[in-house]
């Protein structure tokens, strides 16, 4: 009897082990078939030629605080500006920097966080504090020329012209100020969207008309002198039924050429309008919150999946699409010497052929995730998500 029980126990243990082994194999098989994250950043090849040389770098030591979990909070300011050989950016204070050497030429004390970044031109630099007050300072002396309370946040840089300063608030109010004395020339309030979770665009001036895109997904054309509205049109139509699908924020500044103006929005379209009456000439699918670029008779944009697309500016047809950088959180696009340049979340800077989208070069910067880039002559200025700046020579 005892031997029989031992036999039963041995059979049970063997069977149990086999069952556990099968379960393990099944789990392993299941794990083997788990799909990769479809939104994981695309891996890139780094064996292309280098085309940049670092000139100088300035770290933003006041760009973050430590949260309770010990994580870095990104800098609020992600916009710098340039005027001549000077660079304007916000670190502990607003600094005026020599682009060639990186030397700080002047500091302007700032007592509050700046959400709008800084804009510069026509002898002044402009920024808006987090409490909604706009400051206009003299470029040479740094002294304040005038200020005005907007009572609302501004998330995008101001537009400076020879006579006016234009700012758009987060609640879709466009203000036009007199450059010299700060007098309000006119203002326009758009019908706000029921749902808006993104930023705001900057207004654009072309042939005496101010083109402004709003969170409700509409583009308006107003006369700069008196604010009279010539037309207002939707950039795209609502395609879904959920609130998120109805989100149509337009954070991209409009762009104009000859008798046409182009605008794009999130979850929407790239649309070409007639400047004079707002008639829609074409509309093609595009979801973006990044600036549009025009090159010859084409338009360039990156969509929300970080694909780079070139469109025919006449009929909207797609000329080429590069999907090699999907989900790499690429920066705005800039053009230099017939090539397209942009940065990504790992601090890489990429160069594409504008004719066909072919990858031509790659360079590694000393910064973190690159959010903003600009070209001045043969220099590339880049800024990362912590507000640090690096200037590189293009060769």
PLM regions and their residue ranges:
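Loop/turn-rich, solvent-exposed surfaces of beta-rich toroidal or solenoidal domains
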Residues: 302-309, 317-351
């Amino acid at each position: 009897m005892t031997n029989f029980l031992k036999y039963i126990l041995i059979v049970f243990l063997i069977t149990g082990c086999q069952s556990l082994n099968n379960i393990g194999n099944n789990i392993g098989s299941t794990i083997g078939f788990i799909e990769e994250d479809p939104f994981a950043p695309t891996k890139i090849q780094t064996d292309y030629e280098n085309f940049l040389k670092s000139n100088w770098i300035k770290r933003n030591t006041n760009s973050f605080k430590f949260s309770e979990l010990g994580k870095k909070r990104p800098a609020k300011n992600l916009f710098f500006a340039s005027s001549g050989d000077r660079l304007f950016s916000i670190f502990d204070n607003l600094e005026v920097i020599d682009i060639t050497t990186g030397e700080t030429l002047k500091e302007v004390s700032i007592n509050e966080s700046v959400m709008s970044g800084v804009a510069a031109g026509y002898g002044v630099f402009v920024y808006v504090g987090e409490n909604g007050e706009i400051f206009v300072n003299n470029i040479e002396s740094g002294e304040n020329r005038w200020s005005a309370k907007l009572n609302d946040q501004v998330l995008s840089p101001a537009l400076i012209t020879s006579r006016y300063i234009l700012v758009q608030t987060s609640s879709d109010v466009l203000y036009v100020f007199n450059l010299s004395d700060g007098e309000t020339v006119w203002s326009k309030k758009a019908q706000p969207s029921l749902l808006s979770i993104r930023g705001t665009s900057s207004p654009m001036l072309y042939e005496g008309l101010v083109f402004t895109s709003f969170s409700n997904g509409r583009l308006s054309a107003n006369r700069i002198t008196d604010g009279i509205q010539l037309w207002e049109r939707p950039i795209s139509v609502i395609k879904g039924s959920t609130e998120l699908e109805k989100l149509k924020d337009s954070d991209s500044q409009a762009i104009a050429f000859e008798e046409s103006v182009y605008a794009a929005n999130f979850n929407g379209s790239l649309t070409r309008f007639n400047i004079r009456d707002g008639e829609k000439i074409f509309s093609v699918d595009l979801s973006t919150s990044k600036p549009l670029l025009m090159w010859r008779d084409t338009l360039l944009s990156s969509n929300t999946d970080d694909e780079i697309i070139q469109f025919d500016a006449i009929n909207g047809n797609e000329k080429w699409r590069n999907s090699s950088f999907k989900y790499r959180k690429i920066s705005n696009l800039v053009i230099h010497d017939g090539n397209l340049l942009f940065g990504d979340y790992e601090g890489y800077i990429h160069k594409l052929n504008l004719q066909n989208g072919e990858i031509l070069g790659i360079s590694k910067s000393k910064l973190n995730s690159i959010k903003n880039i600009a070209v001045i002559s043969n220099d590339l200025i880049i800024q990362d998500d912590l507000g640090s700046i690096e200037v590189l020579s293009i060769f």
